[in-house]
Amino acid sequence: MAVWRSCLRASSSRHRLSSLFFSHHLKPSSFISHSPPLFSPSPSPSPTCFSPLHRLLSSGPEFPIGSQEIIPTDDSSLPVLAVVDFLEGFHEFTGLPWWMIIASSTVAVRLALLPLLILQLKKLKTISELLPKLPMPIPETPTLKGSIDQFSHFLKESRAIGCPSFLWFFPYLSVQLPCFFLLMASIRKMSLDGHPGFDSGGVLWFQNLSDLPGGSFGPVFPILIATFHYINIQISFDTSTIRQTTGLTGLLMRYYKLYLEILSVPLFFVGYAIPQGSLVYWVTNSSVNIFQQLSLKHPTVGAKLGLLSQGATPGMGHSMEISESVIKYVDSDSKEQTLSLQTLTPEELLSLSVQVLSKGDKETSIQLLRLALEKDPGYVRGLVLMGQALLQKTQLSEATEYLELAISKLLDEDPSDAEDVELLMLASQWAGAAYVQQGKLKSGIIHLERVAKLREPGDPKSKEHYFEALLLLSSALYKEGQSDEAAKILRVVVDHNPAYKPLLEQCEDENELVSDLVSRRKDHF
C-alpha cells in the first residue's frame, strides 16, 4: 500500500506540473490542427510510475504529453504520407497556390503514365491485327473439356504467329487506378486535416480547399464531375464499335455502357461529400482523360505514334465524311482534301467500302459498292463484298442474287489462283448461309458442298472460313435428315477442332437410335 500511495502522489504532482506547464506555454489553438485518430489506443492498465521510459518517449522533445499521456498516432499509410510530403515540398519550392499544386501534380502523373499507355495500345493494335487469323477461344457449344481443348489450341496458335500476350489489356489500368486512389486519399487527408494553406489555397468560388461544396456555386464541382464522367464514357464506347460488336459480347458492352452512364447521377451527389481540394484533383484528372482520349483517337496523332492499323491511312480510314458524290478526308499532312467519288476506280471504292463497313456503317458501305459495280458490273470481289454487306443487313434475297452472280463468274473462269479460290469459297459459304436462313436447305447444301470439295486452305484465316462452311453444311444435312452425311462432315471438323466433338457424338447417337428402330421393325415382320 505504501508503494501504491507513493506512486499515486508522484503521478498527482506530475499532473499538476504538466497542467501548469500547458496553461502557461501552450495555446489552445495548438491542439486544433491535430485531430485525434478515429480509433485511439486503449490506455495502459499499469500505473504511470512503472513506465518512465514510456512517458519519455511518448512526450517528445518539445511538447510533453499532459495528464492523458496518449501516444500520438497517424492512421495514414506510408504511401499517403509520402505523397503529402512530396506535395508539401513542391509547394514550398514553387510557391504556387495549393489548387495549382494539385492540378499540376495531376497532369504530371498522367504524363508520366502516358508512355505505358502508348506501349499498351501498340501491343493491342498488334493483337487486333492477328486475332482474325486465330481460331475462336471458346467453342460455339461449350463443354468443360471442349472449352479447355479449344482454349489450349487458341493459345498455341497465338504463340505460333507471334501474337503478344493478352495480359497487355491490363498494365495501364493496374497502374493508373492505384495512382488515382493514392492521390485522392492523400489530398483528402490534407483537406480533412486542415493542412496549412488549404483554407486559402483555392481561387474563385472554392477559396477554402478543406470545405465541402456549398453556397450558390456549390453545384459547380458535382456537375463537372458527372458531366466529365459521361463524356469519358461516350468517347470510350463509341457508337460504331458497339454497333459492330454482335452477339453476347455486344449485348454486354451495351449494358455495361448503360450502367456507367447511370453512374453519372450518384457521382453528382457524391461530389457534395468530398472536400474541394479533392474535387480539384478529380475534375483535373477527368479533363486530362478527355483530352488524352481525343488526342490518341486523332488520325494524325495515331499515325505519328504508330497506333494505326496496317493498311489504314489516317484520312481515308479514320477521318472521313461522305456526302452524295463527294468524300472529304484528312491526308498524311493533316490537310483536309475533297475528292469526287466519280474519279475513284472500283478497287479504290471497294477499299473505302471495307473501311466504312469495319466501322459498322453498312449503308455508306453499300452505297460505295453500288457505285463500284456501276463502273464495273463484273467486278467479282465487289459482288462478293456486296453480298456480305446485304447479308449483315439481313436482306437475304438481294444478297443471294449478288453472290450467285459472283459464283457463276468464278466458275466460268475456272478459278485456279489462290485469290479466286478464296473468293469462290467465301461466296459459296455466304450464299449457303443466306439460303439456310431463308429455310431453303437444299439450295444452301448445294453451295456448301462446293466448299467441301475444295482443298483445305493453308492460310489460318481462310482455314477458319473453310471449317465454318463445313460446320454449317453438317447442320443443314442434319436438319434435312441426312445424319450419316452430317456425321462424316463433322468428323473432318472435329479433326481440326476437337471442341465440336459433342456435336459429333450427338449425331452418332441419333444414328444408332435410328438403326436400332429399323432393326426392331425387321424383327417384328
UniProtKB/Swiss-Prot annotation:
Subcellular location: Plastid, Chloroplast thylakoid membrane
Main location: plastid
A GO MF term: membrane insertase activity
InterPro entries found in the cross-reference section: TPR-like_helical_dom_sf (IPR011990), YidC/ALB3/OXA1/COX18 (IPR001708)
Protein's GO biological process: mitochondrial cytochrome c oxidase assembly
Matches recorded under CDD domains: 5TM_Oxa1-like
Transmembrane region(s): 99-119, 167-187, 217-237, 262-282
Keywords, alphabetical: Chloroplast, Membrane, Plastid, Repeat, Thylakoid, TPR repeat, Transit peptide, Transmembrane, Transmembrane helix
Family stated for the protein in its record: Belongs to the OXA1/ALB3/YidC (TC 2.A.9.2) family.
Name this polypeptide is given: ALBINO3-like protein 2, chloroplastic
Natural source organism: Arabidopsis thaliana (Mouse-ear cress)
